[in-house]
């Protein structure tokens, strides 16, 4: 993983909603974009964070301080 990972605001939006358990379809409805676009942003975030899936991307983003940790 690069020392400084920079995610776009939309990638962070998609990761945020994914962290809350939303599907791509649900996130798309919330953000007013297509579900495929959500998948595109999540795939880019995964690549930038050096992980294989959205769960790992959320965990890495929290670890890097890009997303706040969720509490129950």
Question: What residue spans do the PLM features occupy?
Answer:
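Helix-turn-helix DNA-binding segment
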Residues: 1-37
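Residue-level detector of secondary-structure transition/capping positions
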Residues: 22, 35, 46, 65-66
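Short polybasic/polar patches that bind polyanions
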Residues: 3, 29, 47, 62-63
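Hydrophobic residues on short alpha-helical segments
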Residues: 12-16, 46, 58
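Basic, Lys/Arg-enriched C-terminal extension of HTH/homeodomain DNA-binding domains
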Residues: 48-72
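Residues within the DNA-recognition helix of helix-turn-helix
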Residues: 41-44
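Intrinsically disordered, low-complexity peptide-like regions
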Residues: 37-39, 51
